Amino acid sequence: MNKLRKLFVVIFSSLALVIASFSTAFSKVEGDTITLGAAVSLTGKYATNGEHTQRGYDLAVKVINDRGGVKIGNKNYKLAVKYYDDESDAKIAAALAQRLIEQDGIQYMLGPYGSGITIAIAPVTEKFKVPMIEANGASRALFTKGYKYLFAVLNSADQYLNSAVDLMAEQAKAAGKNLQM
């Protein structure tokens, strides 16, 4: 299984736990399907990454559904995703998140591509108490607001290089060099 596939299985495993813990009483459930919402950049400057995000979400949904879906109580549910194109625009993304929640009845969100757009959507999902699994936002600002309904699978960006810097310092010390920071 390649790294991308593993990442999205982790994302959706996390989502499955969130869904199971919040119950289906308030979710968009039609028959045996739980519909998730996502405002993703399919056009605009983030389109390439948004398309990768959408394909990753679709792959994860397929893998989970092929394995029987998400079990809540004694019942298994398949997953589906309702997408809207946020046009790589934070304001449009926030409006679409609100539309997904208020008009489409979505109660579980998948995050968009990028920190800036996630920063715009997070207050909307918080306002409506809708859990959002964020796979592509890493800005420190996402982790310092005290969001209760935002679940991230990435570390914050300021933590990305910590282990690399530690390794570099360790190797410099082993080579007898004094690394100054």
Predicted segments with their positions:
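Extracytoplasmic ligand/sensor domains, especially the bilobed periplasmic-binding protein
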Residues: K91, I106-M181
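Short, well-ordered beta-strand elements
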Residues: T33-S41, L79-Y83, L179-M181
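Short, low-complexity disordered leader/linker segments with a strong preference
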Residues: M1-T35
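Short, well-structured alpha-helical segments in soluble
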Residues: K82-Y83, E87-Q107, A169-Q171
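Signal peptide-proximal N-terminal region
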Residues: V29, R55-A80, K173-A175
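Extracytoplasmic
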Residues: G31-T33, G37, N76-K78, A95, ...
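Short beta-strand elements in bilobed, periplasmic/extracellular small-molecule ligand-binding domains
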Residues: G69-E87, Y147-Y149, M181
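Extracytoplasmic "Venus flytrap"
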Residues: G37-D58, Y84-K91, Y113-G116
